[in-house]
Design a protein with these regions (language model features):
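Compositionally biased, intrinsically disordered low-complexity regions enriched in proline and serine
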Residues: 12, 30, 38, 120-122, ...
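Glycine-rich short-loop/terminal segments
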Residues: 14-107
C-alpha cells in the first residue's frame, strides 16, 4: 500500500491538470477518484506515522499564516465560495475556518483545524483555486510539494 501511495504521489505531483471538460475528461476523472475514495478503507494503520510526522509541519506553517492573517475558527461554513474567502482576507485580514465536519482518525481537532487553515491559505488564497474538483485537485498537488517526505 505504501508503495502504491508513493507512486501515486509522484504521478499526481507531475500531473498538470490538462484534462478537458466533459464526460471523458474531468467528469470521468472525478468519478474515478470518488469511486476509489468510496472503496478505500476508512482507517489505514500504515498511514498513522505519516500523519504524526506532519504535526510539526502543521504547527510551523500555521504560525506563519497567523503572522499574515487573523485566523478565526468558527462553527459554521463561513464562505459560499472561494471568492468570498479571498475577499474576506483581502478586505478584513480575516480567514475563517470551519470546525464543522472535521472529525479525523489521527489528527486531534486543533491540528485538523490548523491543517484546514493551511489548506485554505496555500490553495484558495495563494494559488487562487476554487471550491470545485479542479481547484481541490490543484490544492492537493500544491500540498504534496510542501509536505514532509515521510
Amino acid at each position: 500500500m505504501k508503495e502504491i501511495l508513493t507512486e501515486w504521489r509522484k504521478f499526481v505531483m507531475s500531473e498538470k491538470l490538462m484534462l478537458k471538460p466533459g464526460p471523458n475528461g474531468w467528469d470521468k476523472y472525478c468519478e474515478l477518484v470518488a469511486e476509489a475514495y468510496a472503496r478505500a478503507p476508512k482507517f489505514d494503520e500504515s498511514a498513522v506515522s505519516s500523519f504524526e510526522a506532519m504535526k510539526p509541519f502543521v504547527d510551523k506553517m500555521f504560525k506563519r499564516i497567523e503572522g499574515v492573517v487573523d485566523v478565526q475558527f468558527v462553527e459554521e461554513h463561513p464562505y459560499e465560495n472561494a471568492q468570498e474567502l479571498r475577499q474576506d482576507v483581502k478586505n478584513n485580514g480575516v480567514l475563517k475556518i470551519s470546525t464543522l465536519d472535521a472529525e479525523h482518525d489521527i489528527f486531534d481537532p486543533e491540528t485538523n483545524a490548523k491543517f484546514r487553515a493551511i489548506h485554505d491559505y496555500m490553495s484558495h488564497i495563494q494559488r487562487n483555486t476554487e471550491f470545485d474538483a479542479k481547484g481541490e485537485i490543484a490544492s492537493y498537488n500544491a500540498h504534496l510539494q510542501t509536505m514532509p517526505p515521510k
